[in-house]
Amino acid sequence: MLKHICLLSVVIFFAACRDKGKGDLLDEMASREINEPYEPIFLQDTAVASLEKVTIKDKYYRTAIEREVVNFYKKYNYQTRWLYQNKPSPLFASYIKTLTELTDYGFFPQNYRQHELDSLVGHLYQHKDSLFLKQLETTDREITASFLLLTRHLTQGRIPKVGDDVRVWKRNKPIFDNVELLLKLKDTDNLSTVIEALQPQQAFYKAMAQKYKELLKDTTSYTPFAITDLKSFAVGYSDSTVVALRNQLGLRGYKPVAQGAPAEVDSLLIEAVKQFQRQVGLTADGAPGALTMSYLQMTPKQQSDLLLLNMERLRWQNKDLGEDYILVNIPEYRLNLYHKDSLKFTTKIVVGKPDTPTPIFSDSLKYVEFRPTWSVPISIVRREMIPRIVDSGDSLKYAKRGYKLYENNKEIDPATINWRDEKTLRRNLAFVEDPSENNSLGLVKFVLHNDMSIYLHDTPSKKLFDNTQRTYSHGCVRVQYPDSLAYQLLKHTAEWNYQKVNDAMQTGRDQYRVHPK
């Protein structure tokens, strides 16, 4: 059963049950008592001003981390956590090791002062003097600040803001208490395992991390070029750039063996281009145009940077997605439904225009509604519909298309409105489109709980799915095969089979809402 939805810059998720592997570890830690240090050293200086004096290499989180450091030592009875009288705790060594391992996930140890802290601790125990305890306290606080910053980055992301439009990026609220986590950690805990549990647990996140690790070692060089005469690119076309195209496809794992001269285009080469286009989400037309070539010639560094950004976005929406979820890849314009990380259904989508982008957030599925009406958002009424009525001079422009006009919940005749009056733009006018196959939302919509009126829906504009770039909506996600999606969502609900879904769309009652079980 699908419950939760998570919209990301790259993906949208619909999730169900929690990931038990991740949840069991964190739940077990949450149930613990506060860890008692093996060799407690009580802080000599417990003033808030002193505890807040830590180095944090992140301006955005600095104030929050300072507060967390103070909170931690207060709850920990003002004792050192990482450093004991005669040696560092095993947890410190584990932390230094873990920071190195996190480079495989695109984290940079220097941001958490790995070498600096390791050196400070080593020097501290080798050169004990009258200031030893004071320096030990200070260093312990610095390690705590480093750890709390890392856990922030793991669970909330490292990029504080992308773009100026708050509609585009809406993160999850934190689901982990980083201070409580540190309070419950034992010296015997495998910190690498704990840190792993804090990261997204989806198979595609782990696959991204594995690919990122491989790309860091990839030294392949790609020489930029373009097909000399793209319009003539077809079987029989001959040019030296065709040889270069074969070579670059070979570097990507495709082996278009020439049927004749290597410089001549043949059917196998065109098929290899199509296969590559399908892999990266482009229209598989076999023509190596500018967009196809930009993907084909992407360097390992460019690929790793893109993966790093996508992994970061997944961390922003770090949720347990469970066994059943839907991933909507916005740049690829595709929706994928998974069960236990196995792809079960896929379809094309249309997403928001550049000026009305599909926002990024996590949510849950509320219900499926068949034969919906469309209550046009007031922003669209004022910005688009009224100006079009004025330009056309036809007061009934939208009435002819099945829209009814309301003001203060009372239906009114659009012919009675002076659409050219500037005051009309300030009136509380509402257009509502009746259910039909021509309704802007089509015959079914998938309603979420968010406060932005963003949902998935059918569309009468089916031809848009033939385009490679599909950014045409006002922010909602249009689905090419909504009937199949509805079936996938409702098939575990009593009596809902594909035929019943089709009947509900074509001949069922209007605004029929079904809550998935």
Task: For every predicted segment, state its role.
Residues 2-8:
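Sec-dependent signal peptide recognition
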Residues 10-11, 359:
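Proline-rich low-complexity regions
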Residues 13-16:
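C-terminal motif of bacterial Sec signal peptides marking the signal peptidase cleavage site
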Residues 18-174:
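Cationic-aromatic interfacial patches
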Residues 18-76, 148, 165-168, 189-517:
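Well-ordered beta-sheet/strand-loop patches within structured domains
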Residues 99-102, 150-155, 185-186, 249-252, ...:
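Generic structural signal for hydrophobic core residues of well-folded globular domains
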Residues 162, 182-184:
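Charged, long alpha-helical assembly modules
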